[in-house]
């Protein structure tokens, strides 16, 4: 198994640097299992949603689905990432200070990692507390 960082994953997804994209593809399409850590996934999504790339929610969903379709790519906990993707898709927008806002995929992953962390410790998460009103639309999130 190998792991890749955010930059390798971005070059693979965007193919915006031909040399680095080819090297990234060689790793990802090689003979080894490729771990995409939660941190690399979250940083990738933040970058893709940011000013430079400006990807929409629908595009982010497609990117994550495409990673699940890659035969060599695995996540730290695929079930948690999958549930986070589901919650992200289902989250309703809220209006904050007159602007429409939606929970981000990293918010959904944080909530689901909290649930997973509690479960592996024999607990059930009572709530994930956040001041982010959009994140508050995710199952299990409440304001303190």
PLM features per residue range, with description:
Residues 138-140:
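Short glycine-/acidic-enriched loop or helix-start segments at secondary-structure transitions
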Residues 52, 117-121, 142:
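Active-site catalytic pocket residues across diverse enzymes, especially alpha/beta-hydrolases
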Residues 45, 49, 65-68, 85:
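Amphipathic alpha-helical segments within well-ordered protein domains
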Residues 5, 36, 103-104, 132, ...:
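Histidine- and aromatic-rich ligand-binding microenvironments
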Residues 72-129:
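Active-site neighborhoods of divalent-metal-dependent phosphate/nucleic-acid chemistry enzymes
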Residues 130-136:
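Short, polar loop motifs at secondary-structure junctions
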Residues 1-36, 52-62, 124:
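Short, well-structured N-terminal submotif of metal-dependent ribonuclease cores
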Residues 38-46:
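Short, conserved active-site loops that position catalytic residues or coordinate cofactors/metal ions
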């Amino acid at each position: 198994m190998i792991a890749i960082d955010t930059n390798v994953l971005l070059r693979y997804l965007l193919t915006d640097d031909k040399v680095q994209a080819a090297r990234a593809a060689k790793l990802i399409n090689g003979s080894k299992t490729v771990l995409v850590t939660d941190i690399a996934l979250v940083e990738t999504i933040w970058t893709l949603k940011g000013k430079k790339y400006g990807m929409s929610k629908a595009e982010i969903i497609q990117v994550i689905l495409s990673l699940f379709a890659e035969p060599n790519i695995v996540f730290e906990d695929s079930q948690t990432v999958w549930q986070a993707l589901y919650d992200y898709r289902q989250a309703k927008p809220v209006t904050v200070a007159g602007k429409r806002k939606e929970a981000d995929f990293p918010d959904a992953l944080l909530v689901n990692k909290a649930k997973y962390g509690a479960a592996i410790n024999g607990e059930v998460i009572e709530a994930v507390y956040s001041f982010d009103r959009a994140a508050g639309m995710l199952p299990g999130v409440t304001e303190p």
